Design a protein with these regions (language model features):
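Cytosolic juxtamembrane helix and N-cap/initiation of the first transmembrane helix
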Residues: 1-17
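Membrane-interface helix-boundary motifs at transmembrane edges
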Residues: 1-3, 56-67, 90-91, 122
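Generic alpha-helical transmembrane segments of integral inner-membrane proteins
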Residues: 15, 80, 102-106
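Alpha-helical transmembrane segments of multi-pass membrane proteins
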Residues: 15-27
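The feature represents the first ordered module of a protein
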Residues: 25-85
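Lipid-handling modules and contact-site tethers
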Residues: 26-28, 55, 90-93, 101
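Membrane-helix boundary connector in multi-pass membrane proteins
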Residues: 83-97
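Alpha-helical membrane-associated segments of multi-pass integral membrane proteins
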Residues: 93-129
């Protein structure tokens, strides 16, 4: 499990979100359109749970890809909400808020790339038999 590169990218994603949740003030990352800190907490906790489940699904590559796609969807929704907030309010601190989904998306895209690479390798081995 841990020796696979996609698991390492998912662990980076997990620890990045965990560090943000534990050490940073959630009010800073809250979106002012909704003015609720609970939404950002739900976002981060759900992404943490989905990442943890994805790490545990290391033998089921399609389920791992599906859970990563759900997480990509959540990050894109958060990214769009922050972008709308920036254009509506003209806030200058949007860049730090955008770091959460951008960094997480990078980790997830790399993890998906290596999951697909493993799947292609398994398919090619099955073809050889």
């Amino acid at each position: 499990m841990i020796q696979r590169i996609q698991t390492i990218f998912l662990l980076f994603n997990f620890f990045y979100l965990l560090i943000i949740y534990i050490f940073f003030d959630i009010k800073f990352f809250a979106v002012t359109i909704f003015d609720h800190e609970i939404l950002i907490e739900i976002y981060i906790i759900s992404c943490l749970i989905i990442t943890f489940i994805s790490i545990l699904l290391f033998k089921k590559r399609f389920a791992q890809l599906f859970s990563n796609k759900i997480q990509i969807f959540l990050h894109i929704i958060y990214f769009l909400i922050i972008s709308i907030e920036f254009f509506v309010s003209g806030s200058l601190n949007f860049f730090t808020k955008l770091l959460i989904p951008i960094i997480c998306l990078i980790f997830i895209f790399f993890a998906n790339k290596f999951i697909k690479k493993d799947e292609d390798l398994i398919k090619s081995i099955d073809r050889i038999r």
